[in-house]
Each structure stands twice: as structure tokens, then as C-alpha cells.
Amino acid sequence: MEKAILITFLIATTSMVYQTIGQEEEISPISPESLAYEPAAAYEYDHELLSHMTTRRIKFLQDCSDKMSSKCNVEMTEGLIDDKPVSEDCCVNFLKIGRECHEGLMTFVFATYELKDVASAILPRSKRMWNKCVETTAAKIGAPLAFET
């Protein structure tokens, strides 16, 4: 009995203090326009970036990307972020895709919305990484060209 009185007292007190709780709330329907999906800025930016590329260029970059092993992709990404050298095996894989592929992929990837702000720091690192691989590994596979420094 005491518990029921306490609960009634708490509800009555709360209803007086917070009068909106004690009143019925009018529920209005939500307009479909307010739920319309609007693409994020990143999507729009990257879509615009791709729209300026030819199908041939997109295919070229896709083929370049397919030539890199996933292990070396991870190692190179970590190397670019941490400014560390990559293994000899990944240097070989890296150099075999060719300078044009490397340069094209780096330019494209770091033009995307998420990475465009770090491009000025990362692109020079990618050139240093390429040059270091040329210096240490190129003689074993034929001599790709180094980037100008």
C-alpha cells in the first residue's frame, strides 16, 4: 500500500513540475521530404572527381591497383603514413607496376575527399619511397626511373 502511495505521489509531483509530461502531446506526421537522403559531401566530391575521368583512365587505374598484392598494399600504406621503408619484396612488386601506375594511383587516391588534405605530406613520401625502391631493388628487375628530387 505504501509503495502505491509513493508511486502516485511521484507521478503527481513530476506531472506538476514537468507540465509537458502531464499533457497530451500532439503527434504530427513526418513529411517524406524531411527523410530524404542527401549524399554526404565526400560522396559528391568523389563522384565529381570520377566524372572528370575517362573510362579508359579509370580502367588503367583499376588495372594498376589489381597488379599490387594486398600484402604490399598494406605495407606501402603503413610506410606512407609512418614514413618508413618497405620490404624488398614489396619494392619489387611496387616497381613492377611501373612509375606511371604508381604516380596515377597516388594522384587519384590523394585527390579523394578523405585524403586530399594530407596529399601535400604524403605525395612527397610516395616519391621518396619509389626512389628508395629504385635505389635498392631496381637492378634486380631492370632499372625503372627514379622521380626527380
From Swiss-Prot:
Keywords: Signal. Residues 1-22 form the signal peptide. Mostly expressed in embryo sac cells. Restricted to synergid cells, especially in the filiform apparatus of mature female gametophyte, via MYB98-mediated transcription regulation. Also detected at low levels in egg and central cells. One of its GO terms (cellular component) is filiform apparatus. InterPro entries: DD11, Prolamin-like. PANTHER family: DOWNREGULATED IN DIF1 18-RELATED, ECA1 GAMETOGENESIS FAMILY PROTEIN (DUF784)-RELATED-RELATED. This is Protein DOWN-REGULATED IN DIF1 11. It comes from Arabidopsis thaliana. The lineage of its organism: Eukaryota, Viridiplantae, Streptophyta, Embryophyta, Tracheophyta.
